[in-house]
């Protein structure tokens, strides 16, 4: 990342992170969503996918909601086995493989992290108290949640509403006519952090968060990293 002065455009720093900071801020966004949308007590978390974000999202979520059990679904058995071995040791919890349906049905929080172009999570799998963060659909062709999932949601949160209506899970739900573009249940993540709207209000609500990625988060984490470096006097 290159950090520029907002007034002059003069480069302030070049951070040779090779995508690391973007990966971290993506996981942080998921954890922030869970802070406001997940139940206060999370016993079981679920993850769909076994890649880098599947790891970082669960690490960040565990800080916010220290769950004791993690259910994992992935297409390749060897990738699932490697993930379970790594994450059970890193988090000190029980990690188990499960079918996608069981991941959703048995978890308090589910994070989907795949580049799937076919819906994985189905409406009938949802249950009271569930929170889902979907972060894999960062183009208009990707989709992890069946559009009908949105019918059962009490709260729907986007990182950027206009962007999610263009591509992401919200985009598909709107195109199928399941979700209105000005749906009263839908608002942005920033409104939660600014406390202008309430998050989860009880343990029965079903909540969804659609994360498509936003540049302002890159700016925020780049500035944070730079300020930390300056305090450490390592640059």
Regions found by a protein language model. Give the residues of each.
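Phosphate/diphosphate ligand-binding glycine-rich loop within oxidoreductases
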Residues: 1-42
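N-terminal Rossmann-fold NAD(P) dinucleotide-binding loop
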Residues: 54-55
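Adenosine-phosphate binding glycine-rich loop
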Residues: 141-235
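Conserved beta-strand elements of the Class I
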Residues: 45-46, 207
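Glycine-rich Rossmann-fold phosphate-binding loop(s) that bind the pyrophosphate
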Residues: 49-51
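NAD(P)-binding Rossmann-fold cofactor-contacting core
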Residues: 63-90
């Amino acid at each position: 990342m290159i950090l520029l002065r907002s007034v002059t455009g003069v480069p302030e720093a070049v951070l040779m992170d090779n995508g690391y900071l973007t990966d971290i801020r993506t996981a942080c966004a998921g954890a922030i969503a869970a802070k406001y949308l997940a139940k206060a007590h999370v016993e079981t978390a679920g993850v769909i996918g076994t890649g880098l974000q599947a790891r970082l999202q669960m690490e960040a979520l565990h800080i916010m909601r220290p769950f004791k059990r993690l259910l994992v679904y992935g297409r390749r058995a060897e990738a699932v086995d490697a993930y379970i071995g790594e994450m059970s040791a890193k988090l000190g919890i029980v990690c188990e493989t499960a079918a996608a349906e069981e991941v959703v049905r048995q978890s308090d929080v589910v994070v989907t992290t795949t580049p799937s172009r076919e819906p994985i999570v189905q409406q009938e799998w949802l249950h009271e108290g569930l929170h889902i963060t979907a972060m894999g659909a960062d183009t208009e062709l990707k989709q992890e949640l069946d559009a009908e999932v949105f019918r059962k949601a009490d709260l729907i949160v986007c990182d950027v509403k206009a962007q999610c209506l263009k591509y992401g899970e919200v985009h598909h739900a709107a195109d199928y006519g399941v979700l209105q573009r000005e749906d009263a249940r839908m608002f942005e993540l920033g409104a939660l952090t600014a406390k202008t709207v309430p998050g989860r209000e009880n343990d029965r609500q079903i909540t969804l968060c659609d994360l498509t990625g936003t540049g302002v988060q890159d700016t925020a984490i780049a500035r944070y990293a730079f300020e930390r470096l300056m305090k450490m006097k390592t640059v």
